[in-house]
Amino acid sequence: MDKIIIKGARENNLKNIDLEIPKNKLVVITGVSGSGKSSLAFDTIFAEGKRRYFESLSSYARQFLGGNDKADVESIEGLSPTIAVDQKSTNQNPRSIVGTITEIYDYLRVLFARVGTPFCPNGHGQIKSQTPKQIADFLFSLSPKSKIQILAPIEIKKGYKINDVLNNLRNQGYLRVLVNNEVYQLDENLPQFLDNKKTDVAIIVDRLILNIDHQTKTRALDAIEFALNYSGGEIAFKVNDDIHYFTQNDVCQVCGFKIKEIEPTLFSFNSPIGACEQCKGLGYNYVPDERKMIPNPNLSINEGGLDYFKNTVNTTNLDWQRFNSIIKHYKIDKTKPLKELDRKEIDLLLYGSDEAIEIDITSANNKKYSSIDYVEGVLELVNRRYQETSSELAREHYNKYMSEKVCKSCKGKKLSSQALSVLINKINIIDFIEKNIDEAIDFLLHLDLNEAQTKIANPILKEVLDRLGFLKNVGLEYLTLARPASSLSGGEAQRIRLATQIGSKLTGILYVLDEPSIGLHQRDNDKLINTLKEMRDLGNTVIVVEHDEETMLAADYLIDIGPQAGVNGGYVIAAGTPQEVMQNPNSLTGQYLSKQKDILVPKTRRSGNGHKVILKGAKHNNLKNVDLTIPLGKFICVTGVSGSGKSSLILETLVKAIEYTNFNPFVIPGEYKDLIGASNVDKIVVVNQDAIGRTTRSNPATYVGVFDDIRTVFENTIEAKARGYSKSRFSFNIKGGRCERCWGDGTIRIEMHFLPDVYISCEECHGKRYNDETLQVKFKGKSIYDVLKMPIDEALVFFENYPGIHRKLQLLVDVGLGYLELGASSTSLSGGEAQRIKLAKFLQRKPTGKTLFVLDEPTTGLHIDDVAKLIKILDKIVDGGDTVLVIEHNLDLIKVADYIIDIGPEGGNKGGKIIATGTPEQLLSKKDISYTAQYLEKYLKKN
């Protein structure tokens, strides 16, 4: 069968649709936000494919895979095995890096274990082990008649007493030992050796005068074999007065630096064998931060300059009294601003006394106690409490004084010194993974290996280079293999999974992808489209939910779902080739693709309010000492290829620098020299795509504050007044009006212990969250539950006579969310929906003319028509006098900006510079160095 035939799909808002999708083609599903694209692609096609696969497994296997409900569809024919590559489930494990999730690091561990060469980290050259034959050859090369002692070195392990070790050797029957080059008879009284001093101990296995006769050789070889076995591969010869050390292990002959057996586990930072002992393989330690302890050095101790003691200074608090002993003993002035104290005094306050001092304590019943002891400083106190506490609440309190600091032992490289001493072509494994993908490919292609090493390395190199090539082909060449997985955007994580799938070379698979172009610059879009076509050409069906114009035009088959969102969507409006969809007068997507509809370029650009914020010398991550000027009162767009440094400059440095300067001294911005004009900003609003709440109790109505107003309306109904119900009666979070069986959740969680928890609708309230008495109170014939189930569009009309409610709902409609239910669970919302809800909340405030709005890729998940609505909202903010700063790749949004800041020219180490600034028209003069300018020119002409 060459088609997937879907009949009667009714999942979510789908309207009983019938659809035929050609197999082994690149199929794009598009439509306005909330129209039903994901309901068709993920909740119907993928869900049914997964369910059928699970049903083919044994009942024993299925019990570990959780519930897989049948999609609400009559039938699907021609379905292949399905794989979803979405933007969810980004790994938050701090130990996961790009190298581990792509499995490239596993191959590298084998490569370094088999081909790497150990070198002494103290500069003593290559570390070589010797074979027993080489050791014996050295012995027999000595001058005849030489006096030889064959020694088995003993390692005195930590915690063991030297005399106890020697007594144990005596009990084993040994006669003589060499201790610090002195011979001792074990059957005589031994001196008491100091355990805290470095002591070299060796058993004298044999003493002989070197001859070349057979008997002497045999005796010497037996002694060598015994010494090597006893000492774990170590041996020494005392020749006259000189000692010569040899080893079968990897040990430096000069300084004794020893390497464990070189196996792949030595290079794993998740294994105790390879991980740095101090940071346990994380590369950083969590330690108290002086900047957080002294957020305002203009304050004195009495004024709360030491933040931890600000509420207990000069009280009977025991911690304070003990700490105050330092202040008394060293006569530190508590009334002086901390910035006027000398460094020694600050160190005493932070790190404590380096001598025992007098401590005076007065108890609650006024008894006085004195003692003499060392006193810990405030940072040491916080660190100890943080490590010792088992209370999450206390840990959270101490947490605000802590920061991640690079591990001093491994310098952030995560591995032990033994692992880091193994090199290939002068670099260790961490040096290699800190290269970006392009640099890594170049390094591997130019490896200098001998014939034997090449034979071992070739199959490993093929696997690594293939995977690196796939990452490059999906536009991720700027990433390093050491990049933490938790720092990846949804789009980056998805494209990494995409690269992994290409590497599998599977055929006959149905892939379902969710907006793979997110976060991708237009320059890299062609690479992504070629990757999708490559997957198709392997004999797979590739279904992509996408809004990107280039991807839609590259599709073999385009499906437009609509016409609108929510209850007004769920229909197949058009299906066919992109050209056929463009010719369909009912298709909104077709109208935009054919340019019958368009987002118009403004005739004039705003000149701003004349004020600026200037950031100087930004060096965070890959930023190259950047000076940034933000003209206020404008719509500003920050552009640049993926990984060029946009987020590092704006979110990590500029935003945090303004927050640190104006609002929150606990925020730690990226490195910069100076910030000028921060006083021109009285509020900074970052609108990101994080969820609006962590539980099902959060919803759009509660987040924007309209639910309080709606509950007030119900409180004022005649029925509610007659029953004496207050506003709180209509809350599903408070006892009284809510259903007590499910505590207002509407669902009940059934714990399955070893299986995933199961959620069922509450039998008492039938999922309505409230008890019957509360639901009997009606407003215009609707209960509070009915109102929460309303789409926002419908609620807007329902509450048209209530200006406060109407205004808040109108803002949600304005940002394109009219299709959402008022009570939609926050956990069911996409990142783009969450971002627009936040925007609607902030738009309730009156413009101050000094607010800076910062949005990170706000067009994520938006159809072209929704982008047009978003632009109207952003224009409204700027027209009110405030400033909008957007990090964006979408050219429809970039072309309407007043001012563009383009960062590049490339990603990673080749980026980090501002290469062009100005209006879109001014940017075109830099198209020789700016990729954004090149595509913007085409786009402006096209539009």
UniProtKB/Swiss-Prot annotation:
Q: What is its main location?
A: cytoplasm
What PANTHER family does the record point to? UVRABC SYSTEM PROTEIN A
Outline the residue ranges of the record's C4-type zinc fingers: 252-279, 739-765
Any single Pfam family the record assigns to this protein: UvrA_inter
Q: Which UniProt keywords apply?
A: ATP-binding, Cytoplasm, DNA damage, DNA excision, DNA repair, DNA-binding, Excision nuclease, Metal-binding, Nucleotide-binding, Repeat, SOS response, Zinc, Zinc-finger
Task: Report the sequence similarity comment from the record.
Answer: Belongs to the ABC transporter superfamily. UvrA family.
CDD domains according to UniProt: ABC_UvrA_II
Q: Which GO terms describe its cellular component?
A: cytoplasm; excinuclease repair complex
Name of this chain's protein: UvrABC system protein A
NCBIfam families on file? PRK00349.1, uvra
So which residues are the signal peptide here?
none
What the protein does comes down to: The UvrABC repair system catalyzes the recognition and processing of DNA lesions. UvrA is an ATPase and a DNA-binding protein. A damage recognition complex composed of 2 UvrA and 2 UvrB subunits scans DNA for abnormalities. When the presence of a lesion has been verified by UvrB, the UvrA molecules dissociate.
> Which positions are annotated as binding ATP?
31-38, 640-647
Which cysteine pairs are covalently linked by disulfides here? none
ABC transporter domain: residues covered: 309-588, 608-937
Molecular functions per Gene Ontology: ATP binding; ATP hydrolysis activity; DNA binding; excinuclease ABC activity; zinc ion binding
Q: Which organism is it from?
A: Ureaplasma parvum serovar 3 (strain ATCC 700970)
